[in-house]
Amino acid sequence: MAGGLMADLEAFRKAQRADGPATILAIGTATPPNAVDQSTYPDYYFKITNSEHMTELKEKFQRMCDKSAIKKRYMYLTDEILKENPNVCEYMAPSLDARQDMVVVEVPRLGKEAATKAIKEWGQPKSKITHVIFCTTSGVDMPGADYQLTKLLGLRPSVKRVMMYQQGCFAGGTVLRVAKDLAENNRGARVLVVCSEITAVTFRGPSDTHLDSMVGQALFGDGAAALIVGADPIPQVEKPCFELMWTAQTILPDSDGAIDGHLREVGLTFHLLKDVPGLISKNIEKSLVEAFQQFGISDWNQLFWIAHPGGPAILDQVEAKLNLDPKKLRATRQVLSEYGNMSSACVHFILDEMRKSSNEKGCSTTGEGLDVGVLFGFGPGLTVETVVLKSVPLQ
């Protein structure tokens, strides 16, 4: 009797799991309508924050923006909103209530916009979505943005939700790692993944004693990305664009306090050590070896690349340290240029850009003609997320 029960349980457990690896079945992106030109942003920023008298600081900020490799960004915050909320424009004025009122509405709304596009591309009824993963570093609320998104989209009340708050810039990799586990361990699961980021929590006026805060003001932009992740795609119905082969997360040695953020009465404060690019470039090869040794790959130029674009210095130092062909980070640099640093959403914008440009250029795969690639998320900790991707042939 016991033996029969154990055999039944074993069969039951096996039946619960998918046969194949998790795949990305669709990608959707969204931004607020308000686009900001990076070249003129210092003039706007110092004017709207009543800081035009700080001329030397403005010149420093202009240099930061000029060196950022960003052409434009999108922002929910407009002149009207900032004029109605003067405390948001000061360097350290109590303003959390005003910021929260904005993001608890706008984060799920922008997430819905991206999710609607992903669901449309996927082409299946939204009732087939079994799980939701929602990620944001913009505000906190109960019930969370995952709940709000479920309501906004009209998903089934029984959908299984995971909410990730305050993870930061590495979390575009985190959500893929968790989605992979959900898809592969629940046969038939279809996971809606949404990362939605709004800089209304971090925007503040300049300070000549906290230049690291100004780095964030020069880099961060708003955006949301959504993916549908599932294993065993239905032939001729679902069209995967990437497979999720392997994932890892690690905390870099000697990196305590390199990047951190604190939610305070003044909003989300952002702190950064100068040597973040050095810490990442010094340790990145170890992550690559750990990921690709098992696949017999040791030439990093054989891979297609998606790296979180924390800023141009990180990309430049990674490129130099690994002797990467400059073309490897093309998609990454393009997204940085067109959108800025959108925290967790960035790597999904880059995936979208890569598969679209691969198709337009007539490449043989979604990974710029290559079979295997790497996705890196970098953020507070310093935490690094590594995702090994397999591309899909393009007909």
UniProtKB/Swiss-Prot annotation:
Cross-referenced InterPro entries:
Chalcone/stilbene_synt_C, Chalcone/stilbene_synt_N, Chalcone/stilbene_synthase_AS, Polyketide_synthase_type-III, Thiolase-like
- Oxidoreductase in keyword set: no
Segments passing through the bilayer: none
Task of the protein: The primary product of this enzyme is 4,2',4',6'-tetrahydroxychalcone (also termed naringenin-chalcone or chalcone) which can under specific conditions spontaneously isomerize into naringenin.
The gene coding this protein: CSF7
Question: What cystine linkages occur within this chain?
Answer: none
Q: In which pathway does it act?
A: Secondary metabolite biosynthesis; flavonoid biosynthesis
- Catalytic activity annotation: (E)-4-coumaroyl-CoA + 3 malonyl-CoA + 3 H(+) = 2',4,4',6'-tetrahydroxychalcone + 3 CO2 + 4 CoA
Q: Which residues form the active site?
A: 169
Q: Which UniProt keywords apply?
A: Acyltransferase, Flavonoid biosynthesis, Transferase
Q: Name one GO biological process term.
A: flavonoid biosynthetic process
Q: What class of enzyme is it?
A: transferase
Any idea what this protein is called? Chalcone synthase 7
The record's PROSITE patterns line, in alphabetical order, gives: CHALCONE_SYNTH (PS00441)
Q: What is its EC number?
A: 2.3.1.74
What Pfam families does this protein map onto?
Chal_sti_synt_C (PF02797), Chal_sti_synt_N (PF00195)
Give an example GO molecular function.
naringenin-chalcone synthase activity
Under the heading PANTHER family, the entry gives: CHALCONE SYNTHASE, HYDROXYMETHYLGLUTARYL-COA SYNTHASE
The family annotation for this protein states: Belongs to the thiolase-like superfamily. Chalcone/stilbene synthases family.
